[in-house]
């Protein structure tokens, strides 16, 4: 609205408006509300609860004790509020998206059914299942009683384990505050660590409080020398694995007792049940309509880039775009929360607030009362979430967790990594909010795309063909202070960003991918993106071992010794003007684990050779010489590897899913199936890494070293085999004698590079068509001759020409005409456009022009010194022409100033820099001297290099740095030689493989053959 009916009760108080509550609120109100254009805030304290203006009406944001605030009341008015539950126990079908672990103490007995009270005396674990009811889509919280936390211990002879456990609890300060129920029973289990372990007696120690597990386990290990097993398994995983449940999917409860009072959650419906009441419906992969929210914030930076702990750096607007997963992409509800009045925005619900505090309460309650399950945004983990939570906690003393989906014991936090200060956008920050699946689309795009930068505008253009209207943060204060119309423009920009992010979520369908990984890995969805791959494989291994009565020991220091990682066949650097065939091992590391039956349970370590008794070398077991000695692994017919069994079952399942996918016509079901097979692929590829991470959940570096040893051996065997093949051998691979035209009898195969799981084969003397003809047959023949299933070599791609620089760095043109670059930056991203474009021209010429390619091949096969004695091949002169023309363009002023600009971020105040001898700081100081507008912190300062005064040679960069606008306005000549040297250095880095793979040698050749015309 335009502001006619909006008033700020905290600047013009109306004492009779509301009943005074007990609480006093701090509000920071922009001065521009009183004086248009004014900066700063007014500090106001008072008892009025948070308020909101919407469609000419004033409403209280919060609600009663049941949490029914403005958003809930709005739903009730629209008729979309959900019905209450029945008042008696009845069957319940519901879908689960999150699983929480909570603890009840005996004080809760009065509010739970009498038959459940025994589970929580003196305390007990209550698993909360959050999801949606099948009947009507209402949000539900199901409290599940009866789950236990436990671990196993192998005790020395004569130790009274129960007494030792009780002693540990007595010594715990935590247990004195919260008494814990304990039970100890003898069970028969087998340790997964090492082949030949017989079933034996172990003590299963069950505790009613999960926080006691770690203390008791450590006590038994350190004080009594017990070997501990599975003390790092939480109650949530026990709940899922012990009962063969799912972390995302449909459940049925045969007797769900509604909780009508004293609820734990703000879900629309809440129930109590026992573990035994539940069952899962795995066959149903459908989804209910979950609510997804994309949000974005706009902030006020009083002194440059906004800082959350500065009182005046307010959050001005929060855009919220809502989408139901059951709807088509694009059918969004758009909401804008804004400080002050705002003109109407078409298609957007605009809610106006008198202060930031009121708006923050509304935002948190929107997530809660509109039953949001998935929250996304762009770089929200690094900026938006920390900013909102810091403002809430440090400025207003709001506890965001208290406004979440759980009334008590919830979590709402941002965990910044230790290196978070190294750079904006560079750190992987974790967001943990109870009952929400946080998905940062910035991190998703970084993982799935390869772009020059990952700004939202760049990504939106690339994926969606959408142009993002940008507002620089310097414009935000002016627009906001301009009044309702300025806030409308700012709001349009803010809502647009959230809508684009929701489009990206739907483009990648990342929420489905997360759910499928969660299901296969037995972990909650919220742990998929942030907790890495270790937990996925650990949970799967735990499940497989549990079915066979095996248990997993806790890792010890001896498990963490180092080993030699994967190596490569050193590249023969140079330019190859003949076809280069690349063959890959399909799923190399998983296939090695399967082929050689590698596992914790099949391994016999040095010193344990007595376990080999009765086994035949080569037939019953294989031996590998590793860093720590000779290790043996028994073969599948003796004992099947758990890791190999997991991989085999996953890959079989993936194959079946891909078969279903090929026949499926329903778009939604196709998406789910596709994400299922991708989830399996991702988890399979994580198995090797799981064993090789020294500080992981269950490391076994001897397995990881065996895998890499076999990988190296396979590469070397394949190299020798391929290089021994003659044209006649290749001709014999034809499907029939007349299927192929005769191959060139002078042709020769040579492996020029081997990279972990692939070989680069130079097909010298063979044409492109000949190479493509025998590529698949060559890979299949090598596989049959050298390897056992499931190891398989496949022809992946063929280059028509290739610049091989160093390991993991090459540029080539594929046979379909596309250029492929790996590990190569043409020039540094910080280079100016002039250098970038000219270097690209050089590369394109070398890869595309037939005469230049021939000359490049000649140069790369002779010592670089011959270029000085014999000169450059004639075919290479067009490259020199490009460089000479660039110099002429510079000297004659034909290069636009914009192409010569560099830029560096002003990361902190000038006084905070240890040294100011940097070009961008030199320009900053010139701004000060000229009394010009100064850049703010986080601004990028542009600069060019100009000729030093008096033409002094060897001047420092800081003396040559100048503001581009000033240089252009005053006709200051640019430093021609400096820019040309930058160009030659960039070109030399690209062309180094032509000159003994030495960038210094390449630079000296280019300097020698480029002509710098006299002034």
From Swiss-Prot:
Catalytic activity: DNA(n) + a 2'-deoxyribonucleoside 5'-triphosphate = DNA(n+1) + diphosphate
Protein localization: Host nucleus
InterPro entries: DNA-dir_DNA_pol_B, DNA-dir_DNA_pol_B_CS, DNA-dir_DNA_pol_B_exonuc, DNA-dir_DNA_pol_B_multi_dom, DNA/RNA_pol_sf, DNA_pol_B_thumb, DNA_pol_palm_dom_sf, DNA_pol_type-B
Keywords annotated in UniProt: DNA replication, DNA-binding, DNA-directed DNA polymerase, Early protein, Host nucleus, Nucleotidyltransferase, Transferase, Viral DNA replication
PROSITE patterns in UniProt: DNA_POLYMERASE_B (PS00116)
Enzyme class: transferase
EC number assigned by the record: 2.7.7.7
Highest taxon listed in the record's lineage: Viruses
UniProt GO cellular component terms: host cell nucleus
Molecular function via GO: 3'-5'-DNA exonuclease activity; DNA binding; DNA-directed DNA polymerase activity; exonuclease activity; nucleotide binding
Biological process per Gene Ontology, one example term: base-excision repair, gap-filling
Oligomer and partners: Forms a complex with the ssDNA-binding protein BALF2, the DNA polymerase processivity factor BMRF1, and the alkaline exonuclease BGLF5. Interacts with the putative helicase-primase complex composed of BBLF4, BSLF1 and BBLF2/3 proteins; these interactions may coordinate leading and lagging strand DNA synthesis at the replication fork.
Function: Replicates viral genomic DNA in the late phase of lytic infection, producing long concatemeric DNA. The replication complex is composed of six viral proteins: the DNA polymerase, processivity factor, primase, primase-associated factor, helicase, and ssDNA-binding protein.
Alphabetized PANTHER family for the sequence: DNA POLYMERASE CATALYTIC SUBUNIT, DNA POLYMERASE DELTA CATALYTIC SUBUNIT
Family: Belongs to the DNA polymerase type-B family.
Name by which UniProt lists this protein: DNA polymerase catalytic subunit
